[in-house]
Amino acid sequence: MSIGILGKKLGMSQFFDEKGRSIPVTLVEAGPCRITQLKSSATDGYSAVQIAFGAVREKLINKPFQGHLAKSGDDLLRYMSEYRVKDVGEFQLGAQITVGDFEEGQKVDVSGTSMGRGFSGYQKRHGFSRGPMSHGSKNHREPGSTGAGTTPGRIYPGKRMAGRYGGKKITTRGLMIMKVDSDKNLLVIKGSLPGKPGSLLNIRPAKCVGLNSSKGGNK
């Protein structure tokens, strides 16, 4: 039963199906993750499984975090995430979560941080059309009108303008797992995923109704 897993984006490639069609895929080094805490309704108010991923040097994490990790194992790990479950009795503290918990053909939701592009203008950030480039025009890449004049006398909140572009949490939903390689801890997922190579990804079974119905639904 798959509840979710943390992984590192490796990059994009292509996958050929049985008909010889080329399918763009993303390679993800997922897990192994260690269960670091089991939360129950009696002690925490809800049931959840907390996992950790990514080896790290001792000096890069503080003492309280080291003490928390020591309850489930000796390895020091950097990233954490938790997943709601109905019954934590099915899980064991210190157990491993691996790509073997997922199946080929399963649909997943993948969350990550999109590529940061810094302070960007109107055309790049929102896809605005540019102004005329000739006939004396000086309005090449300007925004144009941003609203009325004296009334309301201000720019309404939410107006699409230049600003910081990217670097936000993005979730891509309903992606299919094309291949599972347990020996190399690899997931081959159809399509593109958020972030640049090396960035952290959170992979969990898709929540959309009916996507995984053939495999018994989400648990």
Swiss-Prot record:
InterPro entries: Ribosomal_uL3 (IPR000597), Ribosomal_uL3_bac/org-type (IPR019927), Ribosomal_uL3_CS (IPR019926), Transl_B-barrel_sf (IPR009000)
Highest taxon in the source lineage: Bacteria
Protein keywords: Ribonucleoprotein, Ribosomal protein, RNA-binding, rRNA-binding
GO cellular component, one term: cytosolic large ribosomal subunit
UniProt KW Ribonucleoprotein keyword: yes
Biological-process GO terms, alphabetical: translation
A Pfam family this chain is assigned to: Ribosomal_L3
UniProt-recorded Gene Ontology molecular function terms: rRNA binding; structural constituent of ribosome
Region (Disordered): 125-164
Complex formation: Part of the 50S ribosomal subunit. Forms a cluster with proteins L14 and L19.
Entry-linked HAMAP family: Ribosomal_uL3_B (MF_01325_B)
Job of this protein: One of the primary rRNA binding proteins, it binds directly near the 3'-end of the 23S rRNA, where it nucleates assembly of the 50S subunit.
The family this protein is said to belong to: Belongs to the universal ribosomal protein uL3 family.
Full protein name: Large ribosomal subunit protein uL3
Annotated source species: Prochlorococcus marinus (strain SARG / CCMP1375 / SS120)
